[in-house]
Structure formats: C-alpha cells, structure tokens
C-alpha cells in the first residue's frame, strides 16, 4: 500500500505534468491524492518543496538506472552502448518522470535542492567512473573529463529525448539507438579497443 506522502508525490507529478509548475495548485494536488490540507502540510511546506522532493527522487531513480547498466565486465564499446540504451529505456518507460526531470524542473527551487542535486550528480559520476577509470588507464577510452565523456554519450540522445518529451518529435527515441551508439563510440572509444574486458578486438 502506498503512503500518504507517496500519494501526494504521485499526484504532484500528474498535476505538474498536465499544468506545469506555475499552473499547478496545492488544492488540485490534494484533491487528486485525496489528502486533507493538514496532511499536505504535514509532509510539505509548499508546492515548491513537494516539487523539489519529487525532482530529487526522480533524479535518484534515473541515476540508479544509469549506474546499474555498466559493470567491470563491459568493454568500452559495450559500456557506451549500455549507457545509451539505459538512458533511452528509462526516458521512454518513465515518460512523465522524464518530462518533469528534463522539461519542468527549475533551477530556482532553492539551495537545499541544488546541494542535494550536486550530491546525486557526484554519485552518478562516481558510479560511472568505477567502470570508466580502468578502461581509461588501459587506453581503451579516449582521455577526457567525466563531464565531457557523459555529454558526448548522453548529450545527443538527450536532444532526441527532449524533442520527444515536448511533442516536437513523435517517433520513439529508441529507433535511433544504433546511430546514437555508433556516433558516441567514435567520440569516446579508442580505435581497436576490445568489446569486452579481457577480450580481443
């Protein structure tokens, strides 16, 4: 059974998805969650706090999907492919959450949310680096910063996903996965790198 807090977060996500952050009201969120005024304010001081909490929970779920997609057994090319698949699969399978994370979320939600976001982003970087660092050391991935590496892999896929989330592009972003993987591999994988760790090219 879901808790009152989970019901409010789910209701908030649905209302933000339909009306945007500005158009959403506490009354509408409460009504959808069948929650009293007292119940809402027991968990959240404002619509903004609920939105910030929702943002961090969705961010954690997205990051968990990304980190779990790669492990020490993946070679450079396979790992890149898995990360792109993980990103596209998560966005398509969690369209409402992805729209909130990438389209609706706001930078002005406060320092508390931004601080927690930085911590989450560091966790993502650390998780990917556990897979990437040995490949870098062996020369199987091209040398570049973690930020540049991630932007080369996820940036192009994310442009496709945002066009789909906003309705500008109707096709499933996963239809382009092979091209996105091929482009990312050219950008970050050293020529001749083996597909799997310990394998041969």
Regions found by a protein language model. Give the residues of each.
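Amphipathic alpha-helical segments used for helix-helix packing
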Residues: 92-112, 129-130, 159-166
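Conserved hydrophobic residue
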Residues: 21-22, 141, 169
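Hydrophobic alpha-helical connector segments
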Residues: 53, 67-96, 149-153, 174
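Amphipathic alpha-helical packing segments from all-alpha helical-bundle domains
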Residues: 60-63, 111-138, 147-151, 159, ...
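Generic hydrophobic, amphipathic alpha-helix propensity
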Residues: 4-12, 29, 50, 54-58, ...
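C-terminal peripheral helix-coil segments that are non-catalytic and often amphipathic
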Residues: 86-89, 125-137, 156, 162-201
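Short, hydrophobic secondary-structure boundary micro-motifs
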Residues: 99-103, 144, 172, 195-197
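Helix-turn-helix
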Residues: 7, 15-49, 53
């Amino acid at each position: 059974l879901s808790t009152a807090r989970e019901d409010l977060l789910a209701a908030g996500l649905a209302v933000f998805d339909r009306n945007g952050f500005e158009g959403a009201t506490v009354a509408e969120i409460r009504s959808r969650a069948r929650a009293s005024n007292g119940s809402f304010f027991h968990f959240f001081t404002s619509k903004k706090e609920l939105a910030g909490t929702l943002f961090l929970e969705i961010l954690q779920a997205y990051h968990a999907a990304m980190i779990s997609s790669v492990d020490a057994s993946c070679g450079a090319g396979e790992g890149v492919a898995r990360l792109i698949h993980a990103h596209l699969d998560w966005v398509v399978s969690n369209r409402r959450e992805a729209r909130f994370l990438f389209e609706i979320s706001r930078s002005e939600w406060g320092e508390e949310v931004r601080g927690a976001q930085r911590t989450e982003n560091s966790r993502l970087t650390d998780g990917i680096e556990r897979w990437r660092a040995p490949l870098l050391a062996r020369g199987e991935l091209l040398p570049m910063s973690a930020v540049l590496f991630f932007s080369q892999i996820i940036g192009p896929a994310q442009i496709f996903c945002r066009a789909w989330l906003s309705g500008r592009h109707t096709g499933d972003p996963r239809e382009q996965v092979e091209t996105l993987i091929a482009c990312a591999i050219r950008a970050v994988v050293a020529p001749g790198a083996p597909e799997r760790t310990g394998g041969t090219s």
